[in-house]
């Protein structure tokens, strides 16, 4: 048995144990493939979301829901550097995707003033609702900033509150999910003896990406009563953890 294979099997056991202890809907035993009113989920974000998209793709497929990642390495943000280039393509991409829900995980590039952040998040809300979808902002995992990120930490720390203000004025078209339930309030590289976050202080490792996926599917089940997430054992051991994106873990 290969080292990678052994790791993924261990991850599966961990997920099942965690979900069973929490009463997570992912372990209800209900059959997969019941999307209810949730037909397609689109993920937006930066390279952190790129890694999380790997188990998400497997989990949504097992749950009978279409999934598409528009997350991007070195970008994917709607405010701050590179965002102008992203906006040139994003409206057409979302229109073509025809999602039910768009998940925007706040990125490590969401730099800008409060006014700039609010304008961008308002624009995202208008764009998402314009294609008939609901917008879910998700807070980013806490990072351990290096010299590149340190000057922008005030912007990143403000971003969730700006997103909440936009959601509060959206008449129910947007919501903010606090992923601190998954990550805690500070960067933690190792959890339960296994690498959960990358040593670079920014990205996730397979265990962390899988825990996030399990949590997100449960939150969607709360909001779409007809949606039954597949049990973790059906998607946590399907080979995605061997992707090169996790080579730093």
Could you tell me what each predicted segment is?
Residues 1-11:
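Bacterial N-terminal signal peptides that target proteins for export
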Residues 17-20:
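C-terminal motif of bacterial Sec signal peptides marking the signal peptidase cleavage site
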Residues 37-120, 239, 243:
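Conserved SGNH/GDSL esterase-like catalytic core that processes O-acyl groups on lipids
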Residues 52, 56, 86, 90, ...:
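Stable alpha-helical elements in mature extracytoplasmic
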Residues 109, 127-157:
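Active-site segments of SGNH/GDSL-like serine hydrolases
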Residues 143-249:
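Catalytic His-Asp segment of secreted/periplasmic serine-dependent ester chemistry enzymes
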């Amino acid at each position: 048995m290969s080292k990678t294979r052994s790791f993924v099997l261990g991850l599966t056991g961990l997920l099942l144990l965690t979900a069973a202890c929490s009463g997570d809907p992912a372990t209800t035993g209900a059959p997969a493939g019941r999307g209810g009113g949730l037909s397609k989920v689109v993920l937006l974000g930066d390279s952190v979301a790129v890694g999380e998209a790997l188990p998400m793709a497997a989990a949504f497929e097992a749950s009978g829901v279409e999934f598409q990642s528009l997350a991007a390495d070195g970008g994917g943000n709607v405010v701050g550097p590179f965002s102008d280039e992203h906006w040139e393509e994003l409206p057409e991409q979302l229109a073509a995707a025809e999602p039910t829900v768009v998940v925007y995980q706040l990125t490590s590039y969401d730099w800008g003033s409060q006014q700039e952040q609010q304008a961008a998040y308002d624009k995202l809300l208008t764009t998402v609702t314009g294609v008939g979808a609901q917008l879910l902002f998700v807070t980013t995992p806490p990072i351990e900033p290096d010299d590149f990120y340190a000057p922008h930490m005030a912007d990143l720390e403000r971003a969730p509150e700006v997103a909440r203000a936009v959601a509060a004025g959206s008449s129910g078209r947007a919501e903010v999910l606090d992923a601190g339930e998954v990550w805690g309030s500070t960067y933690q590289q190792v959890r339960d003896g296994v690498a959960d976050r990358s040593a670079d202080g920014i990205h996730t490792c397979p265990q962390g990406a899988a825990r996030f996926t399990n949590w997100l599917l449960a939150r969607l089940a709360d909001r779409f009563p007809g949606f039954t997430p597949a049990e973790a054992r059906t998607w946590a051991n399907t080979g995605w953890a061997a992707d090169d994106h996790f080579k730093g873990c």
